Amino acid sequence: MKKLLLLLLIIPMVSFGQTKEELELCLAMQSSNFMTDSEAENALDKILNNIGASKNFVLTPCSEINNAAATSYKGIRYILYDKEFMQLINSRTNNWSSLAILAHEVGHHINGHSVDILLYAADVVETKSLENKRKQELEADEFAGFVMARLGASLNNALAFTEVLLKVI
């Protein structure tokens, strides 16, 4: 289990590459009736039930971001995910991969990393430094490693996932 946590701490998982404009556009184009995927909801519930946390954010698909992201918009916290990206990752590895990605994004919310995207767009909040971004990614990775270990993921599950993720991203 310690090796799994260490591996997940060393290899950055997700959250590279989304610009605030892409995320804002995705959220703005969604209606207030978010449609989600039951498989993603079930995976998220599995993560939250395992750590005893309540769901205080919205899980919503957001096509063409080729990733997943934790953010907030107009005071509501979201986890956005690209269904095709998640399917691609899972097709090349296993179900642990989507759990790890979602756990990483939950980690951003749990650790207080998500700031309202409108504040960034309006330049009310200063963009984080590279050092701060890396620190936050490691904190989210640590949380994901903790969750995955509690759910019973093996070191081989983590290795398979990280090998594919590095090729895809």
Q: Could you tell me what each predicted segment is?
A:
Residues 3-13, 17:
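Sec-dependent N-terminal signal peptides
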Residues 18-169:
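A Zn2+-metalloprotease active-site environment signal
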